[in-house]
A protein has these predicted regions:
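Long, internal low-complexity/basic segments
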Residues: 1-13, 21, 25, 129, ...
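Active-site rim elements
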Residues: 7-20, 64, 84-94, 106-111, ...
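Beta-strand elements within well-structured catalytic alpha/beta cores of enzymes
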Residues: 18-25, 29, 46-51, 77-79, ...
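Solvent-exposed, polar/charged alpha-helical surfaces in well-ordered, non-transmembrane soluble domains
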Residues: 27-30, 34, 101, 105, ...
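Histidine-centered active-site microenvironments of extracellular/periplasmic hydrolases
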Residues: 34-88, 95, 148
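Short, surface-exposed helix-loop/turn micro-motifs enriched in polar/charged residues
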Residues: 39, 69, 91, 111-113, ...
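C-terminal cap/loop subdomain of S1 sulfatases and analogous C-terminal strand-loop tails that border
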Residues: 53-59, 85, 97-100, 105-179, ...
Length: 222
């Protein structure tokens, strides 16, 4: 095989396996829902469909996960909540840290003071509308750089429209650099606007907020 033929063969094998996994998950979820329906348990069950991360399928020249671009950064989250009319869409910024407080809230158990995250129940009960004091930013940090995947260490923050990513290497082998994206104008994150004058105020604001969140979370490495 030529290098091009080998690359094509690997890609086709990869896509086929990926689609097989998707079908298997779909079938398994269907079996669970059928069981709940058959045993009259739907009205007494909270159903949560989610994942630990998204996945790259060649976007940004990447596969797998780890980087803070949308394809991996965003995760699916579907919740069926008894008594809710359903069909709603929440725009609030949520994360997997919110799952445990949500389950405790549903069970009528108070969240421990040292537990991170917020209950999603208020959002579920108000057709996707978040409380006024809900979080405005999300923080992300990837620090496990290995030769296996060569994903650079980085951290960053995002709101509903903008994202700041800071790449670093504490060994000094790779100069630190930043990326800033306007997700409304560039949802595929193909245009880094970190040096564009029109975004300079926003970049400064996001850098200050990023450092504030690092301090709040006790982040030592960045």
């Amino acid at each position: 095989m030529t290098p091009q033929e080998l690359a094509l063969w690997k890609y086709q094998r990869y896509i086929k396996n990926y689609l097989r996994v998707i079908k298997s998950v779909d079938d398994s979820v269907g079996e669970i829902l059928d069981y709940l329906e058959a045993h009259d348990l739907m009205d007494n069950t909270v159903i949560v469909y989610t994942s630990d991360q998204g996945f790259y399928m060649g976007e940004h020249g990447l596969f797998d996960k780890r980087f803070m671009y949308e394809e991996s950064y965003r995760t699916p989250l579907l919740i069926r909540y008894p008594g809710n009319s359903g069909g709603g869409r929440a725009e609030a910024l949520v994360q997997n840290l919110d799952f445990a407080p949500t389950y405790l809230d549903i069970a009528g158990v108070e969240k421990p003071e040292n537990m991170s995250g917020e209950s999603l129940v208020p959002i579920l009960k108000h057709n996707g509308k978040a409380p006024l004091r809900w979080r405005k930013y999300l923080y992300y940090h990837f620090y496990d750089h290995t030769t296996e995947h060569n994903a650079l260490r980085h951290d960053g923050i995002s709101d509903k429209r903008y994202k700041l990513i800071h790449f670093y290497d504490e060994t000094g082998n790779i100069p630190a650099y930043d990326e800033f994206y306007d997700l409304k104008a560039d949802p595929s994150e193909m245009r880094n606007v970190i040096d564009e004058r029109k975004y300079s105020r926003l970049v400064k604001k996001f850098n200050k907020k990023l450092q504030k969140m690092r301090d709040q979370l006790g982040v030592q490495e960045y």
